[in-house]
């Protein structure tokens, strides 16, 4: 079979890969993209999108139980887990099909199969129909990541699940253990707990959502406990003993080892990059444990080879991958894109209440030597939040006292994942406290709390 030549080959069609392919095509490049599973990658098929569909079902279920608060009468509230999962899978299927349409629209050649790199500038694709040989001056690695599995805690799909199993559960857990309280673990804990599972969350660090500001973590823990979750911090899972229909987890904390019985365990202890079976060692690509080492422009050090998204390391966020994809495509086409500033990438967790943040935590800002001005504003002081029946939460802003630079923003409460982008834009534009204070926020909106938090940092809050 004849070798096919392209300007750019993208390996992996997740949010980093397919966006890179689109942008490269827009810039006049002849582009191919290779995907071994489904267009859209983990995010669209097994991560960001289907989990949000599940969580939306849980949110509606929760609101139906609160109907009386809103002057409504509802009886016979129940859920059909199979139908909930079917809706989630349908959403993923719809969007995956949309990616296929985008590839056709932008004249990107799609190869469904597994890729390897036998030499610089060359890619071999094993498809159902045979082997394809491709060449390109520029190759973008966007192969994503998968769930990390620790020895003794490996998933079996029956009693012990990864996120993939949790996204299409064959049964509703009655007594659930979630190992890890990062975004993935907490979102699944929130989903199953809302539907009625007796849920325990184990976290090895000293607090849940450990990457968040300490005040947000503390507030989240109280909210989760109020919802019926058990939160065990500074605790490790030493061993899982499995038998018919149950798992005995041996948990260790400062007091010693205790044993607890569950019918389901979800392991959410991080992810590892898909770096295997690509031939990276042959090319001399530098690997740091589970990810490819890159510079600020996602260059691997091998001429013409780039790595974006989860395979290139933290933060493991789809929007970071997409932005890197655009940046690399523009670089390949001869442009001069700006490198991404990691501190200006927002993180969002879609538990109840939602959590969102950007920039430094208060502790990190102090460690960096800044003199701070810190503002806080509670949801209970916002009219829209009260009208929505969502008066729990707060917004915290952190400023450099000397320059007025917004160093960080941290939120917990209803719809904060939609609010955080305001502060992201502020950081990108290098706005100061004066710019934010003089901005008119619409009323009545939740966004008014963003303004009030800034005002509070400078002793000017109006509604507390």
Question: Where are the regions a protein language model picked out?
Answer:
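FAD-site-proximal beta/loop scaffold in flavoenzymes
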Residues: 156-172, 259-334
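Short hydrophobic core segments
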Residues: 9-11, 115, 133-144, 178-179, ...
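Beta1/beta-strand and adjacent pyrophosphate-binding region of the FAD-binding site
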Residues: 2-14, 172-179
């Amino acid at each position: 079979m004849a070798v096919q030549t392209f300007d750019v080959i993208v390996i992996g069609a997740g949010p980093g890969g397919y966006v890179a392919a689109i942008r490269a095509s827009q810039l006049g490049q002849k582009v191919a993209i290779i995907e071994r599973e489904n267009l859209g990658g983990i995010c669209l098929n097994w991560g960001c999108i289907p989990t949000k569909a599940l969580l939306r079902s849980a949110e509606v279920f929760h609101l139906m139980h609160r109907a009386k608060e809103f002057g409504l009468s509802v009886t016979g509230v129940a859920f059909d887990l199979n139908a909930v999962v079917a809706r989630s899978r349908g959403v993923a299927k719809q969007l995956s099909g949309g990616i296929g349409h985008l590839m056709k629209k932008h004249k990107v050649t799609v190869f469904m199969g597994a890729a390897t790199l036998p030499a610089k500038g060359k890619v071999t694709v094993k498809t159902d129909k045979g082997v394809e040989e491709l060449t390109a001056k520029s190759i973008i690695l966007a192969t994503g990541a998968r769930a990390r599995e620790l020895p003794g805690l490996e998933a079996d799909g029956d009693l012990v699940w990864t996120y993939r199993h949790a996204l299409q559960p064959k049964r509703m857990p009655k007594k659930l253990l979630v190992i890890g309280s990062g975004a993935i673990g907490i979102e699944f804990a929130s989903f199953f707990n809302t539907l009625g599972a007796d849920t325990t969350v184990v976290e090895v660090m000293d607090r849940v959502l450990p990457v968040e500001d300490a005040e947000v973590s503390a507030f989240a823990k109280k909210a989760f406990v109020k919802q019926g979750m058990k939160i065990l911090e500074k605790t490790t899972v030493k061993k899982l003993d499995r038998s018919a229909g149950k798992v005995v987890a041996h948990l260790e904390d400062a007091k010693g080892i205790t044993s607890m019985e569950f019918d389901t365990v979800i392991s959410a202890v991080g992810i590892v990059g898909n770096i295997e079976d690509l031939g990276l060692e042959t090319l001399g690509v530098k690997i740091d444990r589970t990810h490819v080492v890159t510079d600020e422009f996602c260059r691997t050090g091998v001429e013409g080879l780039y790595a974006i998204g989860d395979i290139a390391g933290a933060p493991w966020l789809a929007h970071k991958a997409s932005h890197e994809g655009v940046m690399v495509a523009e670089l390949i086409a001869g442009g001069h894109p700006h490198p991404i500033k990691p501190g200006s990438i927002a993180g969002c967790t879609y538990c109840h209440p939602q959590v969102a943040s950007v920039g430094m935590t208060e502790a990190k800002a102090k460690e960096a030597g800044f003199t701070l001005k810190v503002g806080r504003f509670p949801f209970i002081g916002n009219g829209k939040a009260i009208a929505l029946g969502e008066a729990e939460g707060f917004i915290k802003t952190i400023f450099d006292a000397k320059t007025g630079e917004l160093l960080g923003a941290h939120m917990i409460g209803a719809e904060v994942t939609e609010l955080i982008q305001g502060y992201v834009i502020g950081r990108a534009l290098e706005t100061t406290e004066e710019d934010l204070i003089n901005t008119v926020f619409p009323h009545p909106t939740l966004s008014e709390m963003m303004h009030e938090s800034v005002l509070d940092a400078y002793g000017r809050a109006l509604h507390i």
